[in-house]
Curated annotation (Swiss-Prot):
Family membership noted in the UniProt record: Belongs to the cytochrome c oxidase subunit 5C family.
Keyword Nucleotide-binding: no
Disulphide bridges, residue numbers: none
Domain of life the protein comes from: Eukaryota
GO cellular component: mitochondrial inner membrane
Protein name: Cytochrome c oxidase subunit 5C-2
The organism of origin for this protein: Helianthus annuus
Segments crossing the lipid bilayer: 15-34
Locations listed in the record: Mitochondrion inner membrane
Length: 64
């Protein structure tokens, strides 16, 4: 019985191009989510000030 040979994968160093592509894609995805979050907050703020200007809401507590 001879020792069986197991084919081991040859490990290579990191691929610079692959790392750049992955980093760019992740950065753009995170930036897009962040931008959408800010657009949503801006929309809510604009709606609040529009209602405040129309007089439909007030930030002053009415005293009875």
């Amino acid at each position: 019985m001879g020792g069986g040979r197991v084919a081991h994968p040859v490990l290579k160093g990191p691929s610079v191009v692959k790392e750049l592509v992955i980093g760019t894609v992740l950065g753009l995805a995170a930036g897009g989510l962040w931008k959408m979050h800010h657009w949503n907050e801006q929309r809510k703020t604009r709606a609040f000030y529009d209602l405040l200007e129309k007089g439909e809401i007030s930030v002053v507590v009415d005293e009875e």
